[in-house]
Curated annotation (Swiss-Prot):
This is Epithelial sodium channel subunit gamma. The chain crosses the membrane at residues 56-76, 538-558. It is a multi-pass membrane protein. This is one of the three pore-forming subunits of the heterotrimeric epithelial sodium channel (ENaC), a critical regulator of sodium balance and fluid homeostasis. ENaC operates in epithelial tissues, where it mediates the electrodiffusion of sodium ions from extracellular fluid through the apical membrane of cells, with water following osmotically. It comes from Xenopus laevis (African clawed frog). Gene3D superfamilies: Acid-sensing ion channels like domains (2.60.470.10), YojJ-like (1.10.287.770). Its main location: membrane. InterPro entries: ENaC, ENaC_chordates, ENaC_CS.
Length: 660
């Protein structure tokens, strides 16, 4: 192609309208897209004749787009949902761990010396309130207990007990249970077992104050004096146990051969050696059957009562602490070998003189983690440190979080839960305000102000045993005499009395059958199904494919962005040129003659104003390097050409341009 043909082609392309992604405006870009897209609704908006028909197609297209967004939102929500499936299998099942505790944590004969002063003040308080006198059987049992003859009530001084006379807001009228002296005080009132005060005259409570601020006091009230005395006793009891070493507490508790009288499992005899010691802070020495610490786990070969665990427990009700344990019997918990036995929350109680049969049904559950649920697989992604060194559970996390806040707020750890590293258990001598601080932290924990409930998450996998309990009178009237005689003879070396049926409890715990249920979750949609449903919705409502979606993304986002950017850049550049043209001042060119001419500086040929230059001297003047000698411009040949022929003829293609 000749040089003139190329110039003509460039000129024609410059004058032709620009379409497609290089369109100068958004309107032209959208018009080009609607004419060239495979989405029929958008094309009908442009090619339709008449305003009414065009608005109809606009409405239909917008409705189709809205339906697509609605259906896709439903698909996304369904993608994060799960469906549960239940599978029932029949196989030999591993027998779970069974933890057994006596409701009385320590033998009274072994712990009475440490609790003598506390029990003396408790008995005196009951006498002051209700005229209570100690039973004769207790008086005989307490013979030999060394109690210091002190007129000062240590425990009542630390936590005074009051009877409420009247309550008006924070103004109280109370009477001291020891001195009967009525006083008026201002304190907050917290009702432990009632929402409101019905009859203040029948309510008993104790007062707790912050040692650092004597005006910050709270009275905890109870609807019954029994509950008030028990709560008051437990606070002092916990304070005493916190100062006793673990070795001494184990020695004060029941031994395995004392608690377990007879044992059978799967038709075979067993004894105390098949149980593992587990010391619980509230129930003392507990014993776990089929613990993971013993190595190989036992398996149930058959279902039914004859193939489970059968034990007879010695309760020893005469050694019970009357203010701590108001019920007689035992407590058991069925749990996995890797789990911590929270027997105080989930345990099942056994009655004395009763045979308790418990049938078990195993259910294993497995949930999906993020993004389907907020559960955790092993607790490693939870910010709360596990203080129990056992498999993660929600209860372990909550207790560990509470203990951490207890140490942070009160400076010491509560006795009911494991001890964190570097912390000590709370007691009056080292931490005088720990009880008041404990109630404040516990209130915040219950009201979910500590953040424990939000930080702790449920475990994704767990085992659960559904228990079916039945009771029967044991031993029967005809077998009671010989059975108690035989058991008394077998335990004669350990006991110095004849057994009664109220000293024993019979437990039979077994699998009802060997069917185990497995509940597992699976995603309702996978990624393939989700994309297929997306494609179906797009094809149904907009007759477009994934390529059309990519085209929409390119035109409506990428190309539109560059069109707007080019428009703003062009406007900015034009405004900048106009501002520069307006701000440029006209600089007058001064006339330089004679010595004012810079070419004459240090030039002896330059003459002064009084000496006009001659022709020869003018030729000797130096010339400027940047100066150009003006020449005659060439003629403008373009004015001689005839351009009307190009304006009348339409050029259809580049070949015509090259031909011209």
């Amino acid at each position: 192609m000749s040089k003139s043909g190329k110039k003509l082609t460039q000129k024609l392309k410059k004058n032709l309208p620009v379409t497609g992604p290089q369109a100068p405006t958004l309107y032209e870009l959208m018009q080009w897209y609607c004419l060239n897209t495979n989405t029929h609704g958008c094309r009908r908006i442009v090619v339709s004749k008449g305003r009414l028909r065009r608005w109809i197609w606009i409405s239909l297209t917008l409705c189709a787009v809205a339906v697509i967004f609605w259906q896709c939102a439903l698909l996304l929500m369904s993608y994060y949902s799960v469906s549960a499936s239940i599978t029932v299998t029949f196989q030999k099942l591993v027998y779970p761990a069974v933890t057994i505790c006596n409701l009385n944590p320590y033998s009274y004969s072994k712990v009475k010396d440490r609790l003598a002063a506390l029990e003396k003040e408790t008995s005196q308080t009951l006498k002051n309130i209700y005229g209570f006198t100690e039973p004769l059987i207790r008086s005989k049992r307490d013979v030999g207990v060394n109690v210091e003859n002190s007129t000062e009530d240590i425990f009542l001084k630390q936590i005074p007990l009051y009877r409420l006379e009247s309550v008006k807001g924070s103004q109280l009228v109370v009477s001291d249970l020891k001195t009967k002296k009525r006083t008026r005080m201002s304190a907050k009132v917290i009702h432990r077992d009632a929402e409101s005060v019905q009859d203040p005259g029948n309510m008993v409570g104790f007062k707790l104050c912050d040692p650092k601020n004597s005006s910050d006091c709270t009275i905890f009230t109870f609807s019954s004096g029994v509950n008030a005395i028990q709560e008051w006793y437990r606070l002092h009891y916990t304070n005493i146990l916190a100062k006793i070493s673990m070795e001494d507490k184990i020695a004060m508790g029941y031994k395995a051969d004392e608690l377990i009288v007879t044992c059978f499992f799967d038709g075979l005899s067993c004894d105390a050696r098949n149980f593992t010691l587990f010391h619980h802070p509230l129930y003392g020495n507990c014993y776990t059957f089929n613990s993971a610490e013993r190595g190989n786990l036992l398996v149930s070969s058959m279902g039914g009562a004859e193939y489970g665990l059968k034990v007879v427990l010695y309760i020893d009700e005469d050694e019970y602490n009357p203010y701590l344990s108001t019920a007689a019997g035992a407590k058991i918990l069925v749990h996995d070998q890797d789990e911590y036995p929270f027997i105080e929350y989930l345990g099942t109680e056994l009655e004395t003189a009763t045979e308790t049969s418990i049938g078990m049904q195993l259910t294993e559950s497995a949930k999906l983690s993020d993004p389907y649920s907020d559960c955790t697989m092993d607790g490693r992604d939870v910010s709360v440190e596990n203080l129990y060194n056992k498999k993660y559970t929600l209860q372990i996390c909550l207790n560990s979080c509470f203990q951490r806040e207890m140490v942070r707020s009160c400076g010491c750890a509560h006795y009911d839960q494991p001890l964190p590293n570097g912390a000590k258990y709370c007691n009056y001598e080292e931490y005088p305000s720990w009880i008041y601080c404990y109630f404040k932290v516990y209130k915040q924990f219950v009201q979910e102000e500590l953040g424990c409930q939000s930080a702790c998450r449920e475990s994704c996998s767990f085992k659960e045993w559904t228990l079916t309990r039945s009771l029967a009178k044991w031993p029967s009237l005809n077998s009671e005499e010989w059975m108690l005689r035989v058991l008394s003879w077998e335990l004669g070396e350990k006991l110095n009395k004849n057994l009664t049926k109220n000293d024993l409890a019979n437990l039979n715990i077994f699998y009802q059958d060997l069917n185990s249920r497995s509940i597992s979750e699976s995603p309702t949609y996978n990624i393939v199904t989700l994309l297929s449903n997306f494609g179906g919705q797009l094809g149904l409502w907009m007759s477009c494919s994934m390529i059309c979606v990519l085209e929409i993304i390119e035109v409506f986002f990428i190309d539109s962005f560059w069109v707007v950017l080019r428009q703003r850049w062009r406007n900015w550049w034009e405004n900048r040129k106009e501002n520069q043209a307006e701000d440029t001042p006209e600089i007058p060119v001064p006339t330089m003659t004679g010595h004012d001419n810079p070419l004459c500086v240090d030039n002896p040929i330059c003459l002064g104003e009084e000496d006009p230059p001659t022709f020869n001297s003018a030729l000797q003047l130096p010339q400027s390097q940047d100066s150009h000698v003006p020449r005659t411009p060439p003629p403008k040949y373009n004015t001689l050409r005839i351009q009307s022929a190009f304006q009348l003829e339409t050029i259809d293609s580049d070949e015509d341009v090259e031909r011209l």
